[in-house]
UniProtKB/Swiss-Prot annotation:
GO cellular component: cytosol; succinate-CoA ligase complex
Pfam families: ATP-grasp_2, Ligase_CoA
Ligand binding (Mg(2+)): N200, D214
InterPro entries (alphabetical): ATP-grasp (IPR011761), ATP-grasp_succ-CoA_synth-type (IPR013650), ATP_grasp_subdomain_1 (IPR013815), Succ-CoA_synthase_bsu_CS (IPR017866), SUCC_ACL_C (IPR005811), Succ_CoA_ligase-like_bsu (IPR005809), Succinyl-CoA_synth-like (IPR016102)
Catalytic activity: succinate + ATP + CoA = succinyl-CoA + ADP + phosphate; GTP + succinate + CoA = succinyl-CoA + GDP + phosphate
Keywords recorded for this protein, A-Z: ATP-binding, Ligase, Magnesium, Metal-binding, Nucleotide-binding, Tricarboxylic acid cycle
Annotated protein name in UniProt: Succinate--CoA ligase [ADP-forming] subunit beta
Family indicated by similarity: Belongs to the succinate/malate CoA ligase beta subunit family.
Domain ATP-grasp positions: 9-245
HAMAP family listed in its UniProt record: Succ_CoA_beta (MF_00558)
EC number per UniProt: 6.2.1.5
Length: 387
C-alpha cells in the first residue's frame, strides 16, 4: 500500500526526522489559506498522487502568492495527472500539498531502503546524487550509490549511519543530523512494516540543517492487519479499479494490454502461462492467480473480472490441482459461464487432483468449452481461437 507524500512526511516526522513543512489542501481556497499560513515568500504546490515524475508532468509548481497557489490548485485538483509511471489515463488528483520553500540548499542527497530478497535483509541506499531519478544513477553511475545491509538481529547501528555520512561528505553537525535521520527511518521501517521508502531529495540547507524534501513510502500489504491507523490512510482512488476489486476477493490480478484472459492457480504457473501464450503468438490480457486454495466463489469472481475487460477476446484457464480439486474448478467454471453469458472462446486445461473427473464434468456440461491436453496445446488452441 502506497502513502501520499504528505502522509509519508507526517509519519517520518513522528519518528524524529526533520521534514519540509506542509499543509494538504483539497480545494483552491484551502490552498490559498495554506500559503498564507506557511508565511513564506515562496511555496511549492505538489499534486498528491501515487506516482513519480510529477515535476516533469506539471504536477509540481513554485508559487509566490496565495492567488497563485489558488490558481495552481484549481488547475490540478479534480484532474488526472499523467506521468511516466502511470497509464494513459493517469492518476486522479484529489488534493495538493502546499510545502514551505527550503531553498537555497547546498546539497541534495538520496536516502532509501528496501527489503532485499536476495540477502533477506533491509538494505539502505544513499547517494550524493539526490533530486534525480535514482534508477538513472544506478544505471549510469552505480559507483555513486552506497549500500548498507542491516543485520536483523541487532538492527541498524549508529556506526553504520556515521560511515555513510562520512562517505557522503557530510561534516560537523550534519553528521549527527544524518545519523538521527537514518536511525529514525530504520525504526519507522521496522515498526511500520515498510516494503520501501525513499527520501529524494534529502536536502542540506545553507545553515547545515538536513531536511526531507520529499517522501515515498510503500507499506507491506500483508502486514496491514497490524496497523489499523496506517490502513486508514489508504487512498483507493489511486488504485486500479479491477486490481482493487480482485484484492477484495483475495485474487492476485494485474491488468495487461493483450486480448487473452488468463485464470491460473499459482503465481509461477501464471507467469509460465503468460510466457507460453507469447511464445505461440498471443498476448495475455492479465496476470490472475486465484491461489492454491481457490474456492468456487473465488473462481467465479475471477471469471467475471477477466470478462469485464472489453479487450478480452478469448480465455485460457490453466489449473493444476493440488490443494484445489479440478472437479470443483470445473463446477465453478460452468456456473460462471452460465452466469456471465460468455461469448468468447474458453480453453480449459486441467491437471492433477481429480483432473479426469473435472474434464468429464466440463464435457457433459453442454457448454462450448475447448479442452486442452497439456500447456502447449492450451496455448496453441487459445491463440488459434482468435482466428
Amino acid at each position: 500500500m502506497n502513502l501520499h507524500e504528505y502522509q509519508a512526511k507526517d509519519l517520518l516526522e513522528s519518528y524524529g526526522l526533520k521534514v519540509q513543512k506542509g499543509i494538504v489542501a483539497h480545494n483552491p481556497n484551502e490552498a490559498a489559506q495554506a500559503f498564507d499560513q506557511l508565511g513564506g515568500k515562496f511555496a511549492v504546490v505538489k499534486a498528491q498522487v501515487h506516482a513519480g515524475g510529477r515535476g516533469k508532468a506539471g504536477g509540481v509548481k513554485v508559487v509566490k502568492s496565495s492567488q497563485e497557489a489558488r490558481e495552481v490548485a484549481e488547475s490540478l485538483i479534480g484532474k488526472n495527472l499523467v506521468t511516466f509511471q502511470t497509464d494513459a489515463e493517469g492518476q486522479p488528483v484529489n488534493s495538493v500539498g502546499i510545502f514551505e520553500d527550503v531553498y537555497p540548499v547546498t546539497r541534495e542527497l538520496y536516502l532509501g531502503a528496501v527489503v532485499d530478497r536476495s540477502s533477506r535483509k533491509v538494505t539502505f541506499m544513499a547517494s550524493t546524487e539526490g533530486g534525480v531519478d535514482i534508477e538513472e544513477v544506478a544505471h549510469n553511475s552505480p559507483e555513486k550509490i552506497l549500500k548498507v545491509e542491516v543485520d536483523p538481529l541487532v538492527g541498524l547501528q549508529p556506526f553504520q549511519a556515521r560511515e555513510v555520512a562520512f562517505k557522503l561528505g557530510l561534516e560537523g553537525k550534519q553528521i549527527n543530523d544524518f545519523v538521527k535521520t537514518m536511525l529514525g527511518a530504520y525504526k519507522a521501517f521496522i515498526e511500520c512494516d515498510f516494503a520501501l521508502f525513499e527520501i529524494n531529495p534529502l536536502a542540506v540547507r545553507e545553515n547545515g540543517e538536513i531536511v526531507c524534501v520529499d517522501g515515498k513510502i510503500n507499506l507491506d500489504s500483508n502486514a496491514l492487519y497490524r496497523h489499523p491507523k496506517l490502513l486508514a490512510l489508504r487512498d483507493k482512488s489511486q488504485e486500479n479499479a479491477k486490481e482493487l476489486k480482485a484484492s477484495e476477493h483475495e485474487l492476485n490480478y494485474v491488468a495487461l494490454e493483450g486480448n487473452i484472459g488468463c485464470m491460473v492457480n499459482g503465481a509461477g504457473l501464471a507467469m509460465a502461462t503468460m510466457d507460453i501464450i507469447q511464445l505461440y503468438g498471443g498476448k495475455p490480457a492479465n496476470f490472475l492467480d486465484v491461489g492454491g486454495g481457490a474456492t468456487k466463489e473465488r473462481v467465479i469472481e475471477a471469471f467475471k473480472l477477466i470478462l469485464d475487460d472489453e479487450n478480452v477476446k478469448a480465455v485460457l484457464i490453466n489449473i493444476f490441482g493440488g490443494i484445489v480439486r479440478c472437479d470443483m474448478i470445473a463446477e465453478a467454471i460452468i456456473e460462471a459461464v452460465k452466469e456471465v453469458n460468455v461469448t468468447v472462446p474458453v480453453v480449459v486445461r486441467l491437471e492433477g487432483n481429480n483432473a479426469e473427473k473435472g474434464a468429464k464434468i466440463l464435457a457433459d456440461s453442454g457448454l462450448k468449452l475447448i479442452p486442452a491436453d497439456g500447456l502447449a496445446d492450451a496455448a496453441d488452441k487459445v491463440v488459434k481461437s482468435l482466428g
